[in-house]
Amino acid sequence: KICYNQPSSQHPTTKACPGEKNCYRKQWSDHRGTIIERGCGCPTVKPGVKLHCCTTEKCNN
């Protein structure tokens, strides 16, 4: 699986995730504004954090 892993609105970068079925995108807001985190897997998130998990290549931008 290839997933995007760049933070927020930075230039897209990808990461190979051997054996992983999912990619994810987490989004939340704080004093800096909207923060986006991308990576491999499908993590558990705290209340108030938007989570999008998906199963195709590079699906989490």
UniProtKB/Swiss-Prot annotation:
Q: Where in the cell is it found?
A: Secreted
Q: What is this protein called?
A: Short neurotoxin 1
Alphabetically, the GO molecular function entries are: acetylcholine receptor inhibitor activity; ion channel regulator activity; toxin activity
Q: Which cysteines are joined by disulfide bonds?
A: 3-23, 17-40, 42-53, 54-59
Mention any one GO cellular component term assigned to this protein in its UniProt record: extracellular region
Q: What does this protein do?
A: Binds to muscle nicotinic acetylcholine receptor (nAChR) and inhibit acetylcholine from binding to the receptor, thereby impairing neuromuscular transmission.
Tissue-specific expression: Expressed by the venom gland.
